[in-house]
């Protein structure tokens, strides 16, 4: 199973890319651990996670083709 992770803002700078594919992850929590293994400095940043354009939590199960976005805090006005 492959999921696509999108990185935005400072998270894209840390990862050096705007997206990366991850295989064999079962949940958002598992995916976060894999991302932290790949980019250890990411643990120092606050970010929100969306799954297929919906803000989510760690307990959701991932499916083939899901798109996960990591988004730093943002302000609007």
Predicted features and spans:
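Ubiquitin-like/PB1-type beta-grasp interaction modules and other compact soluble beta-rich domains
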Residues: 1-76
């Amino acid at each position: 199973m492959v999921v696509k992770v999108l990185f935005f803002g400072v998270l894209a700078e840390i990862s050096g890319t705007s997206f990366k594919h991850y295989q064999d992850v079962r949940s958002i929590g598992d995916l976060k651990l894999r991302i932290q293994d790949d980019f250890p400095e990411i643990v120092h940043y606050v970010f929100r996670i969306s799954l297929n354009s919906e803000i989510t939590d760690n307990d959701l199960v991932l499916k083939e083709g899901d798109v996960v976005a990591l988004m730093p805090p943002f302000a609007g006005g």
